């Protein structure tokens, strides 16, 4: 029994232990289920986060690819821009080098032009002082009145030629005087310190040749050498007619008439003192420079290297018919005999009696005078221009010949006279026979133009070669015929030398006009029809006829710019410059503007 009860107790105890273990296992299962549920939730959350991170990474990767593509494009664009900027940099470097060279050239050109303008201003002021109308045309200039640099040039010139200024013991009134011929010779030579006044080789050759030919022997001093071939110098009875207007014509400039009327005994004494005080070389070479042309200023070679060729090309534009007419009319002029009234004036007879050598006696009487053979005929002014005839101050360097009918009141006054053109006057050739004939003639202005010497050399326009050599002959080597622009009225009335005005009134340089202007050498050779040829530009045109007395009437006063008041400048009435050579100041300004455009 006791075993059964023990077994019963052991069975109950085992049953309790089993229920306890079962209860514990249930608790563990519940805990495990909760843990598994938690882990599943965490796993699901981690998967969601992983999906988000994966999507984010995918977006980042796509953005990175897009950025890579954009960066590549930008790099290509930057490379192209760098190449373009390198090319532009190289081009701009070349342009900077070119602009630097242009600036240097422009600076040199500006310096040259400034120096040239200063020299031209000084020379123009000096020429205006020397050549303006004063009490006498043959005014003796004092050395102390001249500018200092020009005084040095005069003294050097006189030392070079082996003479000195007249002493006060011999000529106390003219102790410090310099004749006009010396001043003309000094002005004819270039200033050695100037860049712009280098003469051409032909000019220097002509200077040396002319000095060598003309200084070969002494000759008597003619007053036509120191002063121009004016009727007042040779014929005192014509002085009043030549220098005073007729009573019925209006006079506008009284001061100019006063200067015209003042060839009195003081002027004659000054002439004689000047002729006695200086050696023969100066009196012999007095105004021969006026028969020359103006050489090209070599400082403008950077502007126009072909200006000399253009001048020489312009020199040969005469047709064969024009040359033939010119030569025939010139021969007709030289074959004429002087009339009885030609040498009637006592002053001219006195001058003609001083002929020293047989050569002078042969050459001089034929053409030593350019004045009117009518001593009793008063010179007349043209009528005053009306207000509708606004006229320009006459250009001394104009090359256009006009008819000289001074009684036609309705026409343009400028068309009634022709000032001597330096281009035409200089168009003669230096030949030995002609130079010998000119050296012996008392009036070298007219004979230098009509230079028919021993060899019968052609005068102006004879051939292009002669014209080209005539251009190289010296006259005021620092000037050009084109130095004065067309509109410049810088006191051209005072720059007019009487020999230019005189020959402009009497001897217009168209060829048959020159033959007609001295038609009084044949006593009754009057109103014949002659073909008048204008030796300017390209063509020839006949002009209306005029009697010999009409063509001889205009005096130096009619030809003077002082008698034509410049009321208003009309461009259609301006003188055409057909034969101008070289560069004028206006052309220089045009070239400078062209350089400025290139620099811009």
UniProtKB/Swiss-Prot annotation:
Enumerate the InterPro entries for this protein.
Answer: Tjap1/BEGAIN (IPR043441)
For the modification Asymmetric dimethylarginine, the affected residues are 380
Sorted alphabetically, which keywords does the UniProt record give?
A: Acetylation, Cytoplasm, Membrane, Methylation, Phosphoprotein
**Where in the sequence is Phosphothreonine found?**
249
PTM-bearing positions, type N-acetylmethionine:
1
Its main localization is cytoplasm
Under the subunit heading, UniProt states: Interacts with DLG4 and DLGAP1 and forms a ternary complex.
Q: What is this protein called?
A: Brain-enriched guanylate kinase-associated protein
Q: Which organism is it from?
A: Mus musculus
């Amino acid at each position: 029994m006791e075993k059964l009860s023990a077994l019963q107790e052991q069975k109950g105890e085992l049953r309790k232990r089993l229920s306890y273990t079962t209860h514990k296992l249930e608790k563990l299962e519940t805990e495990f289920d909760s843990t598994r549920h938690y882990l599943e939730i965490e796993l699901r959350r981690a998967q969601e986060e992983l999906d988000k991170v994966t999507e984010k990474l995918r977006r980042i990767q796509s953005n990175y690819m897009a950025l890579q593509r954009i960066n590549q494009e930008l790099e290509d664009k930057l490379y192209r821009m760098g190449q373009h900027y390198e090319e532009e940099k190289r081009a701009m470097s070349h342009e900077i080098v070119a602009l630097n060279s242009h600036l240097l050239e422009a600076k040199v050109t500006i310096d040259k032009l400034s120096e040239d303008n200063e020299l031209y201003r000084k020379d123009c002021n000096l020429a205006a002082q020397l050549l303006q109308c004063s009490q006498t045309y043959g005014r003796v200039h004092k050395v102390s009145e001249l500018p200092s640099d020009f005084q040095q040039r005069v003294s050097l010139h006189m030392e070079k030629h082996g003479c000195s200024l007249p002493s006060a013991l011999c000529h106390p009134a003219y102790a410090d005087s310099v004749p006009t011929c010396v001043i003309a010779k000094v002005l004819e030579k270039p200033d050695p310190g100037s860049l712009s006044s280098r003469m051409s080789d032909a000019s220097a050759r002509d200077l040396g040749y002319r000095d060598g030919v003309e200084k070969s022997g002494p000759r008597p001093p003619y007053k036509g050498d120191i002063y121009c071939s004016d009727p007042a110098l040779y014929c005192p009875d014509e002085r009043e007619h030549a220098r005073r207007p007729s009573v019925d014509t209006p006079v506008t400039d009284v001061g100019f008439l006063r200067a015209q009327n003042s060839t009195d005994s003081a002027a004659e004494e000054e002439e004689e003192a000047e002729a006695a005080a200086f050696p023969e070389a100066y009196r012999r070479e007095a105004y021969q420079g006026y028969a020359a042309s103006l050489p090209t200023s070599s400082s403008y070679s950077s502007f126009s290297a072909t200006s000399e060729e253009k001048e020489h090309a312009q020199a040969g534009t005469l047709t064969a018919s024009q040359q033939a007419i010119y030569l025939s009319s010139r021969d007709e002029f030289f074959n004429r005999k002087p009339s009885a009234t030609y040498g009637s004036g006592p002053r001219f007879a006195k001058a003609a009696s001083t002929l020293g050598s047989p050569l002078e006696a042969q050459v001089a009487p034929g053409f030593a005078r350019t004045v009117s053979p009518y001593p009793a005929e008063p010179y007349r002014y043209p009528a005053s221009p009306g207000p509708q005839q606004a006229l320009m101050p006459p250009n001394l360097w104009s090359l256009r010949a006009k008819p000289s009918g001074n009684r036609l009141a309705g026409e343009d006054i400028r068309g009634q006279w022709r000032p001597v053109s330096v281009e035409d006057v200089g168009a003669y050739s230096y030949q030995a026979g002609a130079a010998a004939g000119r050296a012996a003639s008392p009036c070298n202005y007219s004979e230098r133009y009509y230079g028919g010497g021993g060899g019968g050399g052609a005068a102006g326009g004879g051939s292009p070669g002669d014209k080209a050599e005539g251009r190289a002959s010296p006259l005021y080597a620092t000037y050009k015929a084109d130095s004065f622009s067309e509109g410049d009225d810088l006191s051209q009335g005072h720059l007019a030398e009487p020999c230019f005005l005189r020959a402009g009134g009497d001897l217009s340089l168209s060829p048959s006009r020159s033959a007609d202007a001295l038609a009084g050498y044949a006593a009754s050779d009057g109103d014949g029809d002659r073909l008048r040829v204008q030796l300017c530009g390209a063509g020839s045109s006949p002009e209306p006829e005029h009697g010999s007395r009409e063509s001889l009437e205009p005096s130096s006063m009619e030809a003077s710019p002082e008698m034509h008041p410049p009321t208003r400048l009309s461009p259609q009435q301006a003188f055409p410059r057909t034969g101008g050579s070289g560069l004028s100041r206006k052309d220089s300004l045009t070239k400078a503007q062209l350089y400025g455009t290139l620099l811009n």
